[in-house]
Amino acid sequence: ASVPQWAYTGQKRAIPEESKMRKVRLVPILALFFSLSALAGSPADQAWQTLADRFIDEMPALNPVGATHLGDHRFDGQLNEVSAEARAEEARFIRRYQAEMAGIDRAGLSRANQVDYALLAHELESSLWSMEQLQPWAWNPLEYTQLTGGAIYSLMAREFAPIEQRLGHAADRLEQFPRLLEQVRGTLVPARVPQVHAETAVRQNKGVLSILDNMVKPALGSLPEAEQERLVTAMEAASAAIETHQEWLENTLLPNAKGEFRVGPDIFDTRLAFALNTPLTREQIRERAESEFHRVRGEMYEVASAIYAEQYPLAKLPEAPDEAFRQVIIRAALEVAYKDLPPRDGIVETAKAQIEQATQFVRDHDLVEVPDDPVEVIIMPEFARGFSIAYCDSPGPLDTGQKTFYAISPIPEQWDDKQVNSFLREYNVYSMQDLTVHEAMPGHFLQLAHSGRYPSTLRAVLQSGTFIEGWAVYAEQLMVNAGYNDNDPRQKLIALKWLLRSVTNALMDQAIHVDGMSREEAMDLMVEGGFQEEREAALKWVRAQLSFTQLSTYMVGYLEHIDLQAEVREAWGEDYTPRRYHDTLLSFGSPPVQYVRALMLDLPIPE
């Protein structure tokens, strides 16, 4: 996952009057360049830039926690409103911008601005549909558990301001927790909440308390005594509000959670179009996923055969093996890789060493420009656990010079030895290499660092998850095909297994929510079809219930990147080099691949 799920969740609040008089702090040099270059363009470009700047100025006030993550710190002391009035205000905000955009001559815009215009139009339509039709505010309690955790974590994780100032804003937000959680209880409709969402919320709700213990309380000594007393009082009030909310989650929400987590074809297809922003339909995605499923398994057998032959040199493999035989050989080769496990408490240290190894490899092979931005491997905060094993938390587009966090979830303490071993087999040292490539180098960390250098702040805010996740999967295959980790065939086999995971994600995503795939069928697809360990598959089953369409972004984005690379290689001919291609590809920010394709190949910008 590229961005922690809490970053942009929760309903939003109306714009305070004082904020209307101030402009958001843009990335100084790039923002100035972008504005001046637009003002030197056509009248349409000038009108568009005025609108885009105003949107970036006004939008953060609607979501104070999201604003902090973006790097706009005007609202660090405020906490989101989740009331019906706040939703109505947001709807008016969206419709106002839709009406203003209709008055701009899109055809008269520069190509770069045509892309940004399309992205904002898409985002506004998607947000309005989600609020008024999907209505997650009524049935998804995770929007709120992650909002409370993100409210404090986003203030404390990065040193964007003096600690005294950040602690003061933490106190401001903590004082508002009782109001927020009371609004949440009045907003959620238990009968509409799926049981799996309620169960996960019960586990996540208290996560913010660990943030107070680990990030806020140790810094109390930085404050004068009076401010210390205020912060302690705010923490006590927030903790009491969280405990009250925990009782409601356990005694009211959970017993009455009767919602259906399967969303059905209509909602799935609409959300798919918004989430992926790709020309591909659900049916086309399934067809390509099924084809890729068989192709990747076939390649896994070829690699596994070589590993098996090295282990058993006297064994003779059949020339035309059936699927059952292929399954046995692939599993036998995977067992060889599973012998190399990281220590239970050493996953973070393993990842730190692997980032250095991967960075040096990228430089040595001149694959892509390596930014000098700081990155730190951390234990995933408790409030964010339960959705994915790892994520890359890059600084917001308005925060410059801040660290990127590569967060890894620890092994749950309640797991028995069998469950721990299953997890470590899945995340063996070769899998950890692939995970680090995906999340950090040259995956999310590198790509998002490049993205942050693009001068359009609007494009930085409206990133495409499909482009981002697709690049990370592409990066996995790029590295192993270039010989990463000493050309070890075990690394190649594990990288193919991870690619197969992306494919099964896409197959399972729509099969569960549209076709009614059962847990047993999903586990069989993952464990037998995808060679995943039981713990990984069980966690993925939960994740597939908690979300829909997001699991399709990995494979769809990867295939779009592969298709684009082939097109550009043919168009550039002898001028093509991996370094030139990758640097150019990543120079446009993180828009959907179809827009990057148009920009790289000088094609019409999709509307």
Go through each PLM region and give its residues.
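Extreme N-terminal basic, low-complexity initiation segments
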Residues: S2-A7
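N-terminal maturation segment of proteins
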Residues: E17-E18, A40-E607
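Bacterial N-terminal signal peptides that target proteins for export
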Residues: K20-P28
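Short, Lys/Arg-enriched N-terminal segments with co-localized hydrophobic residues
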Residues: Y8-K20
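Juxtamembrane/membrane-water interface recognition
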Residues: T9-K12, L36, R297, Q565
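Bacterial N-terminal signal peptides
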Residues: V27-S37
